[in-house]
A protein has these predicted regions:
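N-terminal alpha/beta PP-like core and its mobile active-site loop of ThDP/TPP-dependent enzymes
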Residues: 1-341, 379, 383-386, 466-471, ...
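Conserved short loop/turn motifs at secondary-structure junctions
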Residues: 213-217, 366, 446-448
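Generic enzyme active-site microenvironment
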Residues: 157, 301, 391, 444-445
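A glycine-rich phosphate-binding loop feature that marks nucleotide/adenosyl-phosphate handling sites
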Residues: 159-164, 395-397, 543
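Thiamine diphosphate
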Residues: 106-108, 112-113, 310-312, 318-320, ...
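Active-site diphosphate/adenylate-binding microenvironment
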Residues: 9-10, 14, 18-19, 32-36, ...
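Active-site nucleophile and cofactor-binding loops and adjacent substrate-binding regions
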Residues: 24-26, 45-55, 70-77, 132-133, ...
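Phosphate/pyrophosphate-binding active-site segments
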Residues: 135, 195, 205, 296-394, ...
Length: 572
């Protein structure tokens, strides 16, 4: 079959089973867009900004496990997408991003809408390609999907000069069924000797803790993780990115850990003698002061990426491999042992954890007339019966959502963890809703974050996406204000958002339903009404207490055991 370069791109997407492409056209990709116009198998979603395309593809990938696909033009189209690409890279999200490029003969001449996309994106992609021949295009696309979805996932970018997709240049189409790359061979299983060594240490542990991250979600390893945790009766804590891999309602779950994790999770981490890290990378928001991190623990680290092991924290038993397979192998080894874990020690350990739990570290003051953001998230959980896909932006509202919306399933909590990208929530929700048209999708955001990509409300109308936007409006860049209160003697430099639009009218101007709530007693009814409109996007502006802070909080430079638990508390 003879195809042009533009037709090859579309045919490759069909052969990869891609159903949705999120993009924005421009001169360098018009040949590809013309090929898209002539077919119906791959649906194109027209966003209103290229950053939105990348975030939507990201949300699609996080909620499905399939690679998200974005298509943007050269120059500013590509640079606008960089924030979304970097967001995906930091959280190891599989994406393939197609960027247009100026024609090959004028590359390097500062041609119109030329940018060094390969150079610009090299630090924030798993790999990138500049296509130099139309004959190489199909194989390059196959490599991109393979690299993006295997090993530690991540975004892969393909930069395509306009002449490569010229409809007058047709070549024989041959899409490879398999790809072999000598320089890229991700491991398929963990070392059995290391697994047995780890189990030997775990069965002797007196104060063990599972510390699990986004890698468990990415590898669809929730079931073997849950099976292993319950077989051993060990406590488990999860990172912001790992929530839902083990059920939030599960009896072994001791809460999220880290800067805004629970008291019991952080104290258990500090006191543990055996730490089993699974698909987590020991980032600074988890460890606190590295020299004080898990001071008495032997550390077992399971990760698909060997470069993550002992990168931030030195580990005792490294296991390189896909976490799903490693966890299955660990459970098999556990079941083969004649002697199980130390039950007497575990009983004492759980008693200590229960004492920490009794601190009730997530309690908040319910007095006063203003709506508390924590309460708003609790109402959201109640109204959606805990069964929504929840996207968020970045800031206090993100932490409140993580703390108070109990996630019992993986891939339901969609947020930017590593890069912390404001503006992520709404376009990510678009990707989620396109992937799950019949599901309930809620975007928890703030008056600061939502305005970063608010133009995507038009995309929602164009494709009839019934997303529910829950805006926790406190009139501030909340997390910035909180840090200024704690560490800058309440000098709120440029963190106030005193001038914002009327979000109800703004939503209505985009063709959606807008609502505003200021009283606690009216919140549940308003939220019930909003979620009752199954076929409409509803923008719910919830005015919340501007003085509310996120607790617990580990202060910068402190250890995990040094937390503020309330406005009145000192470090504990």
């Amino acid at each position: 079959m003879e195809l042009s370069g533009g037709e090859i791109v579309v045919q490759c997407l069909k052969d990869e089973g891609v159903e949705h492409v999120f993009g924005y056209p421009g001169g360098a990709v018009l040949h590809i867009y013309d090929a898209i116009f002539k077919q119906d198998a791959v649906k194109h979603i027209l966003v209103r900004h290229e950053q939105g395309a990348a975030h939507a593809a990201d949300g699609y990938a996080r909620s499905t496990g399939k690679p998200g696909v974005a298509l943007v033009t050269s120059g500013p189209g590509a640079t606008n997408a960089v924030t979304g690409i970097a967001t995906a890279y930091m959280d190891s999200i599989p994406m393939v991003v197609f960027t247009g490029q100026v024609p090959t003969p004028v590359i390097g001449s500062d041609a119109f809408q030329e940018a060094d996309t390969i150079g610009i994106t090299r630090p924030c992609v798993k790999h990138n390609f500049l296509v130099k021949r139309t004959e190489d295009l199909a194989e390059t696309i196959k490599k991109a999907f393979y690299i993006a979805t295997t090993g530690r996932p991540g975004p892969v970018l393909i930069d395509i000069p306009k002449d490569i997709t010229d409809p007058g240049n047709k070549v024989t189409y041959d899409y490879p069924k398999k790809i072999k790359m000598r320089s890229y061979n991700p491991v398929s299983k963990g070392h059995l000797g290391q697994i047995k060594k780890a189990i030997g240490i775990m069965l002797k542990a007196e104060r063990p803790v599972f510390y699990t991250g986004g890698g468990v979600v990415l590898d669809n390893a929730a079931k073997p993780l849950t099976d292993l945790v319950e077989a051993l009766d060990f406590p488990i804590t999860q990172t912001l990115m790992g929530l839902g891999a083990y059920p939030g309602s599960g009896k072994h779950f001791i809460g999220m850990l880290g800067m805004h994790g629970t008291y019991e999770a952080n104290m258990a981490m500090h006191e543990t003698d055996v730490l089993i890290a699974v698909g987590a990378r020991f980032d600074d928001r988890v460890t606190g002061h590295v020299k004080q991190f898990c001071p008495d623990a032997k550390i077992i680290h399971i990760d698909i990426d060997p470069s993550s092991i002992s990168k931030n924290v030195r580990v005792d038993v490294p296991i390189v491999g896909p976490v799903k397979q490693v966890l299955r192998d660990m459970l098999k080894v556990v079941n083969e042992q004649k002697k199980g874990p130390n039950k007497e020690a575990l009983k004492k350990w759980w008693a200590q954890i229960d004492k920490w739990r009794s601190m009730d570290c997530l309690k908040y003051d319910t007095k006063g007339k203003m709506i508390k953001p924590q309460y708003a998230v609790e109402v959201l959980h109640k109204v959606t019966k805990g069964d929504a896909f929840v996207t968020s932006d970045v800031g206090q509202h993100q932490m409140f959502a993580a703390q108070f919306y109990q996630f019992d399933k993986p891939r339901r909590w969609i947020n930017s963890g590593g890069l912390g990208t404001m503006g992520f929530g709404l376009p990510a929700a678009i990707g989620v809703q396109m992937a799950h048209p019949d599901a309930t999708v809620a975007c928890v955001t703030s008056e600061s974050s939502i305005q970063m990509c608010i133009q995507e409300l038009a995309t929602c109308l164009q494709y009839d996406l019934p997303i529910k936007i829950i805006l926790l409006n406190n009139g501030f860049m909340g997390m910035v204000r909180q840090w200024q209160e704690f560490f800058y003697e309440s000098r709120y430099s440029q963190s106030g958002m005193s001038v914002t639009p009327d979000f109800v009218k703004l939503a209505e101007s985009y063709g959606h339903v807008g609502m505003r709530v200021e009283k606690s007693e009216e919140l549940e009814g308003a939220m019930q009404e909003a979620f009752g409109m199954k076929d409409r996007l509803v923008f719910l502006d919830v005015v919340v207490d501007p003085a509310e802070n996120v607790y617990p909080m580990i202060a910068a430079g402190k250890g995990q055991h040094e937390m503020y638990l309330s406005p009145e508390s000192e470090l504990v």
